[in-house]
Amino acid sequence: MKIGNREFQTKGHTYVMGILNVTPDSFSDGGKWNDRDRALKHVEEMIAEGMDIVDIGGESTRSGYTLLSDEEEIARVVPMIEVVKANFDIPISLDTYKSGVAEAGIRAGADLINDIWGLKYDARMAEVIAKSGLAC
């Protein structure tokens, strides 16, 4: 399977996806990576530790989270996708379940969509991904 410019073998290999949450209320890192320079340093460290794909998320899905508008989520993830794409040669996954955010992320350079709802939340998501040719 090709993701970005890399070929991933589907048998006999394990791959590591690193998480870059750009949310102020993440349950796993509490918004540590909202700053561009700290985020880039974190991606660099994860690559050095063996990360194969970076997963960028802009909306917390912790228990009791507040639903963001597409515009709010796009404002968080698109600049980070662009800066990671410009600085590193690594496939970028976008963690979103909203088709509008996925479209913006794909335009910004995302190589994969990570939809935690499995294409069941947003009726347009499957169409957006199919038209883009990206993996999901």
Where are these regions (language model features)?
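Conserved anion-binding
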Residues: 24-28, 60-64, 101, 108, ...
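N-terminal amphipathic alpha-helix/helix-capping segment at the start of soluble metabolic enzymes
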Residues: 1-21
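Glycine-rich, proline-tolerant flexible connector loops at the mouths of alpha/beta enzymes
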Residues: 26-28, 52-79
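Conserved, mostly hydrophobic/aromatic
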Residues: 20, 46, 50, 95, ...
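Short, well-ordered coil/turn segments that N-cap beta-strands
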Residues: 11-16, 51-52, 88-90, 109-111, ...
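Alpha-helix-loop-beta-strand connector modules within alpha/beta enzyme cores
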Residues: 66-94, 99, 103, 127-136
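Catalytic beta/alpha-barrel core
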Residues: 88-97, 111-121
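Active-site mouth loops of central-metabolism enzymes
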Residues: 22-41, 66, 91-93
